[in-house]
């Protein structure tokens, strides 16, 4: 096979081909007893609810760069894939489908609903697998897990039973966040507060057996049907005499006690508050302190129950309207005020949360949190990158509360508890039904009847076991012994407590170790305006569309390059009108630049591999050889150091600069004349091949498919081998720094190019002469040594060099490179007068346009009425026009003088 590249790189052919190659040859599947120090991590399991979004693309590409780097550094690298069963999210999707069919899950029944859920999971999981492969992730698919599969279920049941036996899991009636849409409890972290314009209603409650009354203020008048008390501050002189007496509840006529409680703010509102213990967290605490009855008004679907009297069966918001209307009609509505307040919404269900008194399972994590805090404070385990997120982690652990682990759903790990029929809530916890009956018969007699708990565990319960259950726990597997604890956990800041802290607590409890050494926190991908992407805003960008348009490597490189620092957000450049991204297009052009340079090298290697060419003789290296090897060494050492401390974006930008500027624009161009001469051809070939090989290896973590495609052709013929397991260049065997004289040559060439642009001489036109002058003998010697390179790169025929510039030269454009004067004679090269006229006209046009724009921006009416974005754009445009005008004015002055 000829070792040449097609004229253009086709990512859509190369990417799936190399992904299959890597998996077929198990490059990502390390043997537990294989060589190398282990480096392991788990993929944050995406929910089986559809497709990946741009946030996933960033979150997964960043650790893949690290994984590929560590693999090339000789580590026994294992990256474990998997998916999350996502109880609430799957219920939301499937119940929406059922509503479109005019049904509910209760119409369908548990078994039929679960059949649908498993079918959905299979389809969604296949989609996600395909997308993860499409991203080029180096995951070990032979070790894939699912949070609800049989192995994980066995682990979850064991953990639940063990924690219950330790007294850490218990059952109780508590106020929970209830989502009427999903009909389940949700954690505090799954609640979003939204600021809304509402009302504050003032209601009059008569004091029993007197002419007095109390006025209470509320944002939820419908809950007055569940009031069991009115609270006042015990030292409030307005109400102190009423403490211990009763008030009459309108509508229902129930008598409720007036209590004194120091939690009441006597300065807020009227200083008297209605107490609804079953539907408000603060009232719940007041109710407990004073032994008030707790009356639940709510059905699971958000309608009111029989405790609401005439409003039973009505939706909560309908009840609100009817209660307010009745209060107004009967005269106990004192007033209504506009009121802006935060309303808690269910993150998944998208509806206002209801505080709801319910029997739930809880996990006391206080002891676990204490041990995890000790490890963090005394040993910095785990270490956070960036370090500031460690404070967030610590704050969550300090402020921890009992974890409500039960959910009133069907899809998930069913709670391994069985209730004793006919008892007052008696139950047994066991690994399976047979064990449950054995325990129950011993405890309650041979005729005992059991009913399995209908609830499932919070999805985060099984996810919190992910680092060790994916390696086989509770079995003591070889993988668990070798790859646990994980070296790295890469995830988003928004789930530091949801997931990271809980994994640490569970791992500490069941393995005695913190489950990961380092936690890398990535930022968000924001849209082109800097806004957070969300389904609600409709401003998401599909990573698959970007990969379809530009290729996977271009998207990967863009996402990582744009990370200015660990944990920083990425603003994604995107034109919604055209569906194009300038940033990803730039990365595609970068890939094409690499392809074209590699194609040139391969075309000039005479079918020889780097091994066949051999290493270049150090004594025969030219200045440009020594320079490119020095720059390669600098770059390799820098990238190795940056990747070692997770500065992934900075490393990507360093590599871009080396490849685009140093290798392609300078060295390849300088190698061209040497390749044409027989006596210099082999030396140029040797250095080109060696530099290309190492450059491809440096590139591999970011652009795995492109680098593999070129590397395979560079090294043909090969047995089964891959760039992904080649040594990562560290640069320790290369020069410490490039020769300084090369930098002077670069400055001179850049100055010649700038003068050419100023004189508007076409880039490909050869300049008859450029005059150089320097009083510095070392500079003149360096120029002499690089004169041929300067002439070649600057496209100059003659390069006279003088110690002192001729002051009598006319019509010369002058520039400076270091202390070297660079003079471009313009006579005969361009029409100086015409050039001056052209510059003058351009300057006049620019001054006119900027004047119009400046006047607009000085107009107060425009600034007050124009969209803020347009004003910002106009100011930026004016600044750009003024900068261009300054450059034109300087050029014109130089030309006229």
UniProtKB/Swiss-Prot annotation:
Under SUPFAM superfamilies, the record lists:
Anticodon-binding domain of a subclass of class I aminoacyl-tRNA synthetases (SSF47323), Nucleotidylyl transferase (SSF52374), tRNA-binding arm (SSF46589), ValRS/IleRS/LeuRS editing domain (SSF50677)
Q: What is its EC number?
A: 6.1.1.9
User: Which catalytic reaction applies to this protein?
Assistant: tRNA(Val) + L-valine + ATP = L-valyl-tRNA(Val) + AMP + diphosphate
Q: Which UniProt keywords apply?
A: Aminoacyl-tRNA synthetase, ATP-binding, Coiled coil, Cytoplasm, Ligase, Nucleotide-binding, Protein biosynthesis
PROSITE patterns, alphabetized? AA_TRNA_LIGASE_I
Compartments reported by the entry: Cytoplasm
* Matches recorded under Pfam families: Anticodon_1, tRNA-synt_1, Val_tRNA-synt_C
What are its GO biological-process terms?
Answer: valyl-tRNA aminoacylation
One GO CC term of this entry? cytosol
Motif: 'HIGH' region; annotated at 46-56
Q: Which GO terms describe its molecular function?
A: aminoacyl-tRNA deacylase activity; ATP binding; valine-tRNA ligase activity
Which residue windows are coiled coil? Answer: 839-897
Placement of sequence motif 'KMSKS' region:
532-536
Q: Where does ATP bind?
A: 535
UniProt xrefs under PANTHER family: VALINE--TRNA LIGASE, CHLOROPLASTIC_MITOCHONDRIAL 2, VALYL-TRNA SYNTHETASES
Question: What is annotated about its quaternary structure and interactions?
Answer: Monomer.
As for what it does, the entry says: Catalyzes the attachment of valine to tRNA(Val). As ValRS can inadvertently accommodate and process structurally similar amino acids such as threonine, to avoid such errors, it has a 'posttransfer' editing activity that hydrolyzes mischarged Thr-tRNA(Val) in a tRNA-dependent manner.
| Family affiliation | Belongs to the class-I aminoacyl-tRNA synthetase family. ValS type 1 subfamily.
- Domain-related comment: ValRS has two distinct active sites: one for aminoacylation and one for editing. The misactivated threonine is translocated from the active site to the editing site. The C-terminal coiled-coil domain is crucial for aminoacylation activity.
The name under which this protein is listed is: Valine--tRNA ligase
